[in-house]
Design a protein with these regions (language model features):
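Long, contiguous all-alpha helical interaction modules
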Residues: 1-9
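Structured, hydrophobic secondary-structure cores that serve as assembly/anchoring elements
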Residues: 8, 12-24, 28, 33-190
Length: 190
């Protein structure tokens, strides 16, 4: 198994955004020992005379409200990394030093991500039926205001969002990632 790790890594690295490793045929293998899939274990299985990937999962086995069950799937985590890297790279290449850190420019950056980039990421990475968005992080803005020695209680949300934060840009995102079909539940009645 260990000698095949590089082939699995190559499979994952070369997987297009519109599919996962689930059920992928491993043409270079003739036979594997059947293995009961376990949470956190990437495994292969025999499907008649074909070797297939059982489920493209990583080793994650604990989940919470931030790291949901979907984060065990390699396709989902790859999509997460892809989007975060793209946004950080875009910010670094095109925004740092080129735009004043004010409300309008922060909103323009958010709008570019939400209305252009996220639309391009649907349907292969993000769920196009969900309102995927990035916006100014109001809670981080409040913390910045408090650090400056002011109170936020008497401020409107717009005043909080417009508060100048120097060169810091605090954003938050709400997105839904997509995965491929992997499990079927079928009920038929007559």
């Amino acid at each position: 198994a260990q000698e095949y790790t590089a082939a699995i890594a190559g499979l994952i690295a070369g997987m297009p955004l519109n599919r996962s490793a689930d059920n992928h045929i491993m043409n270079d293998l003739k036979e594997v020992e059947d293995y009961e899939p376990k949470i956190g274990k990437f495994s292969l299985y025999m499907d008649e005379d074909i070797v297939r990937v059982n489920c493209g999962v990583n080793s994650k086995t604990t989940f919470d409200s931030t790291w949901k069950k979907d984060t065990r799937k390699i396709k989902v985590v790859e999509g997460m990394c892809f989007i975060v890297d793209d946004i950080r790279d875009t910010f670094k290449k095109y925004w740092i030093g080129n735009y004043i850190s004010d409300y309008d420019n922060k909103m323009n950056f958010c709008s570019n991500i939400t209305k252009v980039y996220f639309k391009e990421m649907s349907p292969n990475v993000l769920n196009g039926d969900y309102d995927n968005k990035v916006e100014i992080d109001i809670e981080a803005q409040k913390r910045a205001i408090i650090i400056d020695g002011l109170e936020t209680d008497g401020m409107t949300d717009l005043e909080i969002l417009q508060y100048p934060t120097g060169d810091e840009v605090y954003l938050t995102g709400d997105v839904r990632f997509v995965d491929t079909m992997a499990s079927l539940s079928l009920t038929m009645t007559m």
